[in-house]
Amino acid sequence: MQVNEIMSDPITIEKSDTISNALYTMEKYNTRRLIVTNEGELYGILTMRNIARQLGTRKKYALPASSIHVTTATTKDFIKILPDTNIKEAITLMKEKQVILIVVENNGVLGWITPHEILKLINSKNLLPDYLCAEDAMRSPITANSGDRVVHARRLMLEKDIGRLPILEDGLLVGMVSEKDLAYAMHAFRNIVSGSKQDTRIKNLILADIMKRGVISVITDTPLSDVVNLMLKEDIGSVPVLDLKDELVGIITRRSIISQISF
């Protein structure tokens, strides 16, 4: 099987466009990434994480998101591959380099392969051994409390390079904050609060104000194939793992599932 059989059409944005329009485009197409172009040519990748990074930068506090250009948050965290690249080679690349794959031919972008495409492949081709369960793919969770400041969560997520943060109250899971939640919260904050007051007012914004409640979770012995089905059905990028006492013991992401594939 070749990558052109599973790749998806990427959504693009010009590097001269604004962060505000990028967020609108991401919301419209339900994506956390955009391909950035320069006069139609591949320039880089814009991610929700880097938008959250830029919107929370103190030196840019006085600027509304409509004045910050896409190019300030663009990265080169991708690898170009040909459409006839073997799927096994592509998955190995993604596991080793922790990047997305851009499918190109004759200098033109044909599509991309993200962890979401690999998850769909795992589901359709039964690529996971039957004996694997949630406990095998979960990672130790990095958490925050609902009363913690949003700026603290942003710093923690960027330092640890994670896209989602389980939120606890009295030791129990009550919510989740994603890089998307951070980006939209920072965007709204900039539009509402004047530049001169942002440095002070941002400290009053806490995670309880922006977190998503009603978190979907699994238990440690849930078959990993069921976790994949759940993530695809609910269109979520991570799932907290609870023990039989309803205590948080881990978190599963798309990439932690991909790491379980063996050929």
Q: What function would you assign to each model-found segment?
A:
Residues 12-30, 37, 79-98, 104-105, ...:
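The conserved cystathionine-beta-synthase
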Residues 1-49, 53:
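Hydrophobic, helix-prone linear segments
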